[in-house]
């Protein structure tokens, strides 16, 4: 069991590095800073477009049921509850763990998901609500340890 979680941790670190590279590439292309992602729905959509295939590929390579990428930005800082609303993607396997199992979109652009044959689930929402993540603020505080030593296993979290 310990080996299984070690492998998941390594895959999580690799996913984080891959997604960070996608964000860096898109920001450099647009000559933007990360802070400028707020209130930039077209750029956030473009990021999700770039991230969805690598995210789905990584998910299919694992024995876990879902994978997500959360960006510390929102499409609309003026909407009610925006302080807890964050862009990103959450994709989940819809059934048995096979290489061709259909994937479902729980968070992210429905248009991006559909374009990649990842259909929105009935619980789909555009963005994550970070007030539903236990200890979210603590997880978002940069640590001094290397990424491969910074992961933590948490209790199962059910999306509303």
Feature annotation, model-predicted:
Residues 1-46, 63-65:
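Juxtamembrane extracytoplasmic/periplasmic/luminal helical "stalk" adjacent to the first N-terminal
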Residues 10, 51, 153:
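Residue-level signal for functionally critical sites in structured catalytic/ligand-binding pockets
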Residues 11-15, 54, 135-138:
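Amphipathic alpha-helical segments that form well-ordered structural scaffolds
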Residues 20, 52-62:
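Short regulatory alpha-helical segment in sensory/regulatory domains of signaling proteins that mediates
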Residues 44-53, 132-134:
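Well-ordered, non-membrane alpha-helical segments in soluble/globular domains
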Residues 58-160:
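Extracellular/periplasmic ligand-sensing ectodomains of membrane signal-transduction proteins
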């Amino acid at each position: 069991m310990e080996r299984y979680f070690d492998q998941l941790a390594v895959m999580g670190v690799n996913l984080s590095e891959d997604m960070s590279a996608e964000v860096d590439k898109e920001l450099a292309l647009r000559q933007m800073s990360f802070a400028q992602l707020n209130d930039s729905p077209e750029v956030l959509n473009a990021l999700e477009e770039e991230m969805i295939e690598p995210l789905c590929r990584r998910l299919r390579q694992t024995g876990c049921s879902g994978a997500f990428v959360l960006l510390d930005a929102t499409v609309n800082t003026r909407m009610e509850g925006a302080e807890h609303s964050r862009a990103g993607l959450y994709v989940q396997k819809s059934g048995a763990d096979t290489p061709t199992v259909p994937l479902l979109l729980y968070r992210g652009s429905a248009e991006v998901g559909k374009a990649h044959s990842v259909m929105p689930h009935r619980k789909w929402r555009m963005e994550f609500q970070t007030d539903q993540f236990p200890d979210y603020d603590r997880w978002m505080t940069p640590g001094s340890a290397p990424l491969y030593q910074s992961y933590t296993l948490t209790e199962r979290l059910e999306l509303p």
